[in-house]
Curated annotation (Swiss-Prot):
One cellular component term from this protein's GO annotations in UniProt: cytoplasm
Recorded superkingdom: Bacteria
Subcellular location(s) per record: Cytoplasm
Entry function: Bidirectionally degrades single-stranded DNA into large acid-insoluble oligonucleotides, which are then degraded further into small acid-soluble oligonucleotides.
Catalytic activity: Exonucleolytic cleavage in either 5'- to 3'- or 3'- to 5'-direction to yield nucleoside 5'-phosphates
First-level EC class: hydrolase
Name the UniProt record assigns to this protein: Exodeoxyribonuclease 7 large subunit
Family annotation (Pfam families): Exonuc_VII_L (PF02601), tRNA_anti_2 (PF13742)
Protein's UniProt keywords contain Hydrolase: yes
Gene Ontology biological-process entries: DNA catabolic process
Molecular function per GO: exodeoxyribonuclease VII activity; nucleic acid binding
Lineage of source species: Bacteria, Pseudomonadati, Pseudomonadota, Betaproteobacteria, Burkholderiales
Record text on subunit structure and interactions: Heterooligomer composed of large and small subunits.
């Protein structure tokens, strides 16, 4: 680097300078002539003062320089360096005038190599985005009512405890299947990708959570792996990522179907609270009952209107009988006339009566057909409503914890009645109670198993 020196002050034109004048002039010269720059080196002699300022030496194999980082800048670094750490410091060159020592005044710091990692992150992000792997249209919404939820993470991760706690609180009826894999290290990305593929092969869960807690960019780097990102993008099971904290973003977050800011938030996105589901089912059942009653009332009203419009055959026969009696009376009165006149008159009346006689048989058949049609309509409506109620009842029974126990799961409580989710909370000879589908079992703890530290164990189940 070529640095042009330009001194506007005529202090150096004096014959004699004091030490203070010299140091002040040199300090101004350094600050005006050398721009802010990045310097790579090893941390040594690190001290964090009570004021919050950092004082350390930045060195390599051939030289060293004193460095200061004031509290406001140090608070933005995100980690506290230790002696021996390789770092990259953004600083300005200055002079500590009381001693005449030149030093670096740092206003930024990152671990050495982070710049290269970030550049690799941006290249892979741009490549996968160009391929359409970030396209919102290819992403799917997780199942609203999952039959089981899978979790891909380390068995020893705090994130796993957070996820299991959130799921037990919100949806205790949903089984959780853990696919254990390391979340950092040389082979972590490959192991995580293998677990995602295994979950798809088994097809035993409806939603997959890929989670880990926070950390540095190096700690989270496994989740920026291209092979893992492509495995997540190709998953037939919707994937929710919950990696790091809210401000952390990885490549997996961009290809996942849904991104959560934390592992706990990922668990909350994966299921609807059980209380909300039961309330919705009750509301739906009440609505269906009211709707069915309205349909039945409307059908009854239509039946009443149809009955009112249909003249009773008995009434028509009675009317015709009355008419016939009247004609007979008139015939008897007219019998006293000439015989021929009476016979002709009688024939005429008989013909008129024949024309006015109601077809009672046809009217009765039509009435019976209408009643049968109305009965069939009511039966179909009642059958449809009963089938819908049966379906809702089956869904409600599926949410019952007793139904889950009937499938072979069990609930373990300690002596205080609290549900046991962590074996390490118990000790030998502790009294426990095991609830199964039909009854409860009292037992004493004789042995406690703990994880052996190997992340390649078969998938564990929690019912």
């Amino acid at each position: 680097m070529t640095i042009g020196l330009s001194v506007t002050n005529d202090v150096f034109a004096r014959d004699i300078l004091t030490v203070a004048q010299l140091n002040q002039a040199v300090g101004q010269l350094l600050e005006r002539s050398i721009p802010s720059l990045w310097v790579r080196g090893e941390i040594s002699n690190f001290t964090q003062a009570a004021s919050g300022h950092w004082y350390f030496t930045l060195k390599d194999s051939r030289a060293a320089v004193r460095t200061v980082m004031f509290r406001s800048r140090a608070a933005q670094v995100g980690f506290v360096p230790r002696p021996g750490d390789q770092v990259e410091v953004r600083a300005r060159v200055s002079l500590y005038e009381p001693r005449g020592d030149y030093q670096l005044q740092a206003d930024g710091m990152r671990r050495a190599g982070v710049g290269n990692l970030y550049e690799a992150f941006l290249r892979l992000k741009a490549q996968l985005q160009d391929e359409g792997l970030f396209d919102p249209q290819r992403k799917r919404q997780p199942a609203r009512l999952p039959r089981a939820i899978g979790v891909v993470t380390s068995l020893h991760a705090a994130a796993l405890r957070d996820v299991l706690s959130a799921l037990a609180r919100r949806a205790p009826q949903v089984p959780v299947i853990i696919y254990p894999a390391p979340v950092q290290g040389a082979d972590a990305a490959a192991r995580l990708a293998a677990r995602v593929a295994q979950a798809n092969q088994r097809a035993e869960v409806d939603t997959l959570l890929l989670v880990r807690g926070g950390g540095s960019i190096e700690d989270l780097w496994s989740f920026n792996d291209e092979a893992l990102a492509r495995e997540v993008a190709a998953s037939d099971i919707p994937v929710i990522s919950g990696v790091g904290h809210e401000t952390d973003f990885t490549i997996v977050d961009f290809v996942a179907d849904l991104r959560a800011p934390t592992p706990t938030a990922a668990a909350e996105l994966a299921c609807v609270p059980r209380g909300d589901l039961l309330a919705a089912l009750r509301h739906t059942a009440e609505w269906l009952a009211r709707a069915q009653q309205r349909r039945l009332d409307q059908a009854a009203q239509r039946l009443d209107r149809a009955a009112a419009m249909l003249t009773s055959p008995a009434q028509r026969l009675a009317h015709q009988q009355e008419r016939l009696n009247t004609l007979r009376h008139r015939l008897a009165s007219a019998w006293r006339g000439p015989q021929g006149h009476r016979v002709a008159r009688l024939d005429m009346l008989a013909q008129r009566l024949a024309h006015r006689r109601p077809d009672t048989g046809r009217a009765a058949e039509r009435s019976a057909a209408l009643l049968a049609q109305l009965g069939r309509a009511q039966a179909r409506l009642a059958a449809a409503r009963q089938a819908r109620l049966d379906t809702l009842a089956a869904q409600l029974r599926a949410l019952d914890p007793q139904h889950t126990l009937a499938r072979g799961y069990a609930i373990v409580r300690d002596a205080a009645g609290a549900i046991v989710t962590d074996a390490t909370r118990l000790a030998a000879r502790d009294r426990i109670e095991i609830a199964v589908a039909r009854g409860r079992i009292g037992a004493d703890v004789t042995d406690i198993g703990t994880p052996d530290g190997t992340d390649g164990n078969p998938a564990l189940r929690r019912g």
